[in-house]
């Protein structure tokens, strides 16, 4: 949602409940925003969260708070001058209800990412009206009631009572629409009854319908209608086109030269057009009947094009065309188009040139392919034929675009200012919006690419930190040459997994089983590593090596190393591992640590301390933790329970006194 909605909430909560209540609300929901920016997007869920927090602070119900927020918005947008727009929609409240969707269309440039709901006036009587609300958001039904109530009171002097008659997919307290696994998000549909004094509007409506000028109007043939609106088409209950104007059929043939011209009549409208406005609208009879007051924009779908065929159709001489049946004219046009298509095939190079961009203007060259045509108009119900007619005109910016579409000035509606606007180079809002939407789509794609790049960077960092400690990696990023460091004292841990290989299996099966077992054991060990107290150095074969005290200096390195060994022993003893066993050796002393290698850099430890720790592990017994004398004396002083093993013959060291680690100071 845009910040203006939250600005209104913040302003009136502070005004009516006080600044302290607002601060308390922000504290409850952990809102970091001290203020909101009008044109910035904020999370939708923030609105119900504020309502729940305000309800907890004031004792009012959640529905009351959402209703209050809706009233706040109407009172607040007058600061931006939007009250003038509301007052201009009509003399009566019902006029406003019929214009809500068109108001949202007007606002789409100021708030281009606005996900506006759709509202249609479905029924009226002396005592009020019924409106149908569609939205991708849930939990906003009470918010809308607050808006309607305040608009009626503020601009029309009416006191209304609004309540929900029917509701589909609306979830109180949330804003994200419900999900259907097969079709994705579901549309929230709510039907409201608004009770108010509507007698004056209904009387005006009855008087208008009963006026003598209406009763004496002569019958008009549909052919005359189609001549006046050459781009219009008529729809039946199945949304199939039953009649169409001459120019829309010719344009469709030019854009689809390989199609059967007779197939235009009788085809579902959504097979020929894409509905651009209103967005996300289901095109069916009931919906269009309810949305007759809403402006529609349909874009003709193109399936193929051949410029020679187009020009052939454009240059056809339709003699006695008024006396011809429309289908016969279509057949003639198709025959001419197909004749030129066969004799002037489009090669690959020409097809590629259709999407060329003029380097001087940045626009696509209209002479190298037809652009799709955009129709803007309104649906009207014709009672005599029980059909809907889409009265429209094409949106064309200038003469270049006119030719790019494949039309001429005399093809446009004979009435209105269509031709004058094209001659003047009028900038249609809908064309600008299409350009904006394309740029917005590119922006979204760029944003997704950046998010993907960030994700790859995080994965790369995680992989790097698995090979090199984070502090060392950060130093290398800063191009510091010093990647080698000496430590006065650390504790080195070696752990070996024993009896992994099953002699009864063949070599391949045994190797696979060994790898699976080692993977489980080492993965469990990784979970026990608590950085920065202990750092995993490497695994070699069946041996796991870790260190405490490097690369982050830790005066309690011996204690943390022993704690790790005890946790590991306890964890694996609790599981039935069969013949598999582990043994651990720990030694403390000085080491030198650094990054070795360039293509596959590794963080390595060097020194006699490492060798002694390895000997402690290799001379240990299964399910035992062997400590060097120095490490044993060090941890015994702080309460660890150790047992003297005596003297052990250590390769390269001779006789060494060692200890068994039994348990920690807490038992």
Curated annotation (Swiss-Prot):
It comes from the Eukaryota. GO terms for biological process: cGMP-mediated signaling; nitric oxide-cGMP-mediated signaling; response to hypoxia; response to oxygen levels; response to reactive oxygen species. Residues 347-358 have a biased composition (Acidic residues). It catalyses: GTP = 3',5'-cyclic GMP + diphosphate. Probably not activated by nitric oxide (NO). Heterodimer also exhibits some stimulation, some compounds (SIN-1 and two of the NONOates) that were ineffective at stimulating Gyc-88E alone did stimulate the heterodimer. The keyword Coiled coil applies. One of its GO terms (molecular function) is guanylate cyclase activity. Heme binds at residue 104. Its cofactor is heme. Binds 1 or 2 heme groups per heterodimer. Keywords: cGMP biosynthesis, Coiled coil, Cytoplasm, GTP-binding, Heme, Iron, Lyase, Magnesium, Manganese, Metal-binding, Nucleotide-binding. It is found in: Cytoplasm. CDD domains: CHD. Belongs to the adenylyl cyclase class-4/guanylyl cyclase family. There are two types of guanylate cyclases: soluble forms and membrane-associated receptor forms. This is Soluble guanylate cyclase 89Da. It comes from Drosophila melanogaster (Fruit fly). The gene is Gyc89Da.
């Amino acid at each position: 949602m845009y910040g203006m909605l939250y600005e209104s909430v913040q302003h009136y909560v502070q005004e009516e409940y006080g600044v302290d209540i607002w601060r308390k609300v922000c504290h409850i929901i952990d809102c970091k925003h001290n203020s909101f920016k009008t044109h910035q997007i904020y999370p939708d869920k923030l609105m119900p969260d504020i309502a729940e927090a305000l309800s907890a602070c004031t004792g009012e119900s959640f529905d009351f708070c959402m209703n209050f927020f809706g009233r706040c918005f109407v009172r607040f947008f007058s600061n931006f001058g939007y009250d003038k727009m509301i007052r201009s929609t009509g003399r009566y409240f019902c006029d406003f209800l019929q214009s809500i969707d068109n108001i949202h269309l007007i606002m789409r440039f100021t708030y281009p990412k606005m996900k506006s709901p759709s509202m249609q006036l479905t029924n009226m009587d002396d005592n009020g009206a019924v409106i149908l609300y569609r939205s991708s958001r849930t939990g906003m039904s009470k918010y809308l009631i607050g808006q309607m109530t305040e608009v009626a009171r503020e601009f029309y002097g009416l006191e209304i009572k609004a309540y929900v008659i029917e509701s589909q997919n609306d979830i109180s307290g949330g804003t994200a629409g419900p999900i259907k696994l097969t079709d994705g998000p579901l549309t929230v549909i709510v039907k409201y009854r608004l009770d108010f004094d509507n007698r004056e509007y209904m009387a005006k409506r009855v008087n208008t319908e009963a006026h003598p000028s209406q009763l004496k109007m002569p019958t008009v043939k549909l052919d005359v209608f189609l001549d006046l609106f050459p781009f219009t088409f008529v729809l039946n209950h199945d949304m199939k086109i039953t009649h169409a104007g001459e120019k829309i059929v010719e344009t469709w043939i030019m854009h689809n030269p390989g199609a059967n011209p007779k197939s235009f009549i009788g085809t579902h409208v959504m097979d020929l057009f894409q509905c651009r406005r209103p967005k996300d609208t289901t095109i069916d009879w009931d919906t269009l009947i309810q949305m007759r007051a809403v402006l529609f924009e349909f874009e003709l779908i193109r399936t193929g094009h051949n410029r020679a065929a187009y020009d052939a159709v454009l240059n056809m001489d339709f003699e006695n065309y008024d006396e011809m049946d429309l289908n016969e004219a279509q057949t003639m046009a198709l025959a001419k188009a197909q004749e030129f298509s066969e004799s002037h095939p489009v090669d690959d190079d020409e097809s590629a040139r259709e999407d060329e961009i003029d380097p001087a203007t940045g626009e696509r060259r209209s002479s190298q392919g037809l652009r799709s045509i955009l129709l803007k108009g309104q649906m009207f119900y014709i009672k005599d034929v029980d059909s809907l007619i889409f009265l429209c005109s094409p949106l064309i910016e200038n003469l270049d675009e006119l030719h790019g579409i494949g039309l001429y000035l005399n093809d446009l509606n004979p009435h209105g200012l269509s031709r004058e606007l094209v001659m003047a180079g009028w900038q249609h809002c809908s064309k600008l919006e299409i350009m904006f939407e394309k740029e917005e789509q590119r922006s979204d794609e760029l944003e997704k690419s950046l998010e993907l790049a960030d994700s790859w960077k995080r994965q790369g960092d995680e992989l790097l930190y698995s090979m090199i400690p984070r502090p060392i990696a950060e130093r290398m990023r800063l191009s510091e040459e010093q990647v080698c460091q000496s430590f006065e004292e650390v504790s080195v841990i070696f752990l070996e997994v024993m009896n992994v290989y099953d002699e009864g299996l063949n070599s391949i099966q045994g190797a696979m089983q060994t790898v699976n077992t080692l993977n489980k054991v080492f993965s469990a060990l990784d979970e026990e590593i608590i950085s920065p107290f202990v750092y995993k150095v490497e695994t070699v074969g069946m041996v796991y090596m870790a260190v405490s005290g490097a690369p982050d200096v830790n005066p309690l390195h011996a204690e943390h190393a022993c704690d790790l060994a005890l946790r590991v022993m306890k964890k694996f003893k609790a599981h039935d591992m069969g013949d598999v066993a582990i043994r651990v050796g720990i030694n403390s002393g000085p080491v030198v640590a650094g990054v070795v290698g360039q293509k596959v850099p590794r963080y390595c430890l060097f020194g006699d301390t490492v060798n002694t720790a390895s000997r402690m592990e290799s001379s240990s017994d299964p399910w035992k933790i062997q400590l060097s004398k120095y490490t044993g004396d060090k941890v015994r002083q702080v309460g660890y329970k150790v047992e003297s093993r005596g003297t052990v013959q250590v390769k390269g060291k001779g006789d060494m006194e060692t200890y068994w680690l039994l348990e920690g100071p807490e038992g």
